[in-house]
């Protein structure tokens, strides 16, 4: 008799415990070890959303935003300046001392890669802008010319290259087939009106009709 009463009390306590758990939810019912009920368990707070710049994503094609070969400013390019020594001549007369000037040659490249920079590589693009090395500034120098036959020396003023620069050229500069080098192109035609050619109109119409 006492055993049956004890079993009834245990059943009532278990039933009351399940009622309390249903009222409070499954958040309070968890294992004391490491397990948490996945449906309504306690989850850690979500991490703050990272900025797009700090995430591991390829931007600008995997290159830094300011890539050397994508710049359009000619001041960021430089070219080699070769020193050239020569004598100034005027007929049979020649200068007593040679003069030194710069020869602008070579391909233009980023200033940070010239002349001896670490990390050289292919920085140009086939379809990119074309930069040419051209003279930038000139200087005037007076030289003394010595003539043979005991003639009196003469003085002459020459113009020498002082510095070079890179100039951006377009594709039109290299398309020589578009330029007319004939004698008619050298003479500007002023005061003349161009008249349409009447010859060959019938033949051209016949060719167009037979083309289809």
Swiss-Prot record:
Q: What is its main location?
A: secreted
Task: Name one molecular function that GO assigns to this entry.
Answer: BMP binding
Q: Family assignment?
A: Belongs to the sclerostin family.
What is the documented function of this protein?
Negative regulator of bone growth that acts through inhibition of Wnt signaling and bone formation.
According to its UniProt entry, this protein's organism is: Bos taurus
- Subunit field text: Interacts with LRP4 (via the extracellular domain); the interaction facilitates the inhibition of Wnt signaling. Interacts with LRP5 (via the first two YWTD-EGF repeat domains); the interaction inhibits Wnt-mediated signaling. Interacts with LRP6.
Keyword presence, Disulfide bond: yes
Task: Indicate where this protein resides in the cell.
Answer: Secreted, Extracellular space, Extracellular matrix
Q: Which gene encodes it?
A: SOST
Please state what the protein is called: Sclerostin
Q: Where is this region: Disordered?
A: 179-212
Composition bias type Basic residues, residue spans: 190-202
Listed SMART domains: CT
Alphabetical list of PANTHER family matching this protein? SCLEROSTIN, SCLEROSTIN-RELATED
Q: Does the keyword Cytoplasm apply?
A: no
Q: What Gene3D superfamilies is this protein classified in?
A: Cystine-knot cytokines
* Intrachain S-S bonds: 79-133, 93-147, 104-164, 108-166
Point out the glycosylated residues in this chain: 52, 174
Q: Which GO terms describe its biological process?
A: negative regulation of BMP signaling pathway; negative regulation of Wnt signaling pathway; ossification; Wnt signaling pathway
Q: Which GO terms describe its cellular component?
A: extracellular space
């Amino acid at each position: 008799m006492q055993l049956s009463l004890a079993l009834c009390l245990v059943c009532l306590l278990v039933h009351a415990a399940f009622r309390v758990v249903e009222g409070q939810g499954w958040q309070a019912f968890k294992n004391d070890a490491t397990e948490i009920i996945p449906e309504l368990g306690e989850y850690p707070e979500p991490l703050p959303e990272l900025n797009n710049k700090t995430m591991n994503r390829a931007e600008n094609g995997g290159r830094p935003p300011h890539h050397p070969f994508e710049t359009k400013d000619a001041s960021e390019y430089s070219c080699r300046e070769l020193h050239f020594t020569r004598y100034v001549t005027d007929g049979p007369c020649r200068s007593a001392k040679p003069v030194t000037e710069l020869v602008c040659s070579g391909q233009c490249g980023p200033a940070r890669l010239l002349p001896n920079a670490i990390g050289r590589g292919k920085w140009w693009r086939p379809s990119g802008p074309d930069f040419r090395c051209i003279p930038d500034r000139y200087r005037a120098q007076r030289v003394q010319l010595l003539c043979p036959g005991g003639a009196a020396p003469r003085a002459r003023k020459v113009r020498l290259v002082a510095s070079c620069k890179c100039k951006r050229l377009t594709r039109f500069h290299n398309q020589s087939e578009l330029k007319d080098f004939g004698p008619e192109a050298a003479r500007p035609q002023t005061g003349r009106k161009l008249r349409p050619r009447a010859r060959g109109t019938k033949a051209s119409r016949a060719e167009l009709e037979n083309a289809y």
